[in-house]
Amino acid sequence: MHCPFCDTEETKVIDSRLVSDGYQVRRRRECGHCHERFTTFEMAELIIPKIIKTDGTREPFNEDKLRSGIQHALEKRPVSADDVEKAINHIILQLRATGEREVPSKLVGKLAMNELKKLDKVAYIRFASVYLSFDDIDQFTIEIEKLKD
């Protein structure tokens, strides 16, 4: 690593520690040329795939959009904010785990439905009715019957 003081490449790590609950490494470094010390931070760069919308356009994954849809389905339901965040983080983890640069928006919808099914069945039906475009009562009945199994 280049020294920020004299720009030489002669630096060595003199101390390393985990920070941010183990998601970052803090390193103290010393320049072998000017002997100045400085701190660097390292963290894994995990990329969330882009979303391929149903019309074929592509857009960056939008965590706020996902959160809004899930919270809308959970409106006035007894689910904690902590549980919502865990569900969102689990969806993001699954998207990263695909290893793909792009994923269809349908995958995000399915992952959200799976998480909602675990959190609250009523919220799941609300979300499914919009996501699956229910247009009659029979579709609600079919989905509710699936939940009973």
UniProtKB/Swiss-Prot annotation:
Cofactor or coenzyme needed: Zn(2+)
A molecular function (GO) term: double-stranded DNA binding
Zn-finger segments (unnamed): 3-34
Function field: Negatively regulates transcription of bacterial ribonucleotide reductase nrd genes and operons by binding to NrdR-boxes.
Domain of life: Bacteria
GO biological process, one term: negative regulation of DNA-templated transcription
Protein name per Swiss-Prot or TrEMBL: Transcriptional repressor NrdR
HAMAP family (UniProt xref): NrdR
Span of domain ATP-cone: 49-139
Entry note: cofactor: Binds 1 zinc ion.
Keywords tagged on the record: ATP-binding, DNA-binding, Metal-binding, Nucleotide-binding, Repressor, Transcription, Transcription regulation, Zinc, Zinc-finger
Family: Belongs to the NrdR family.
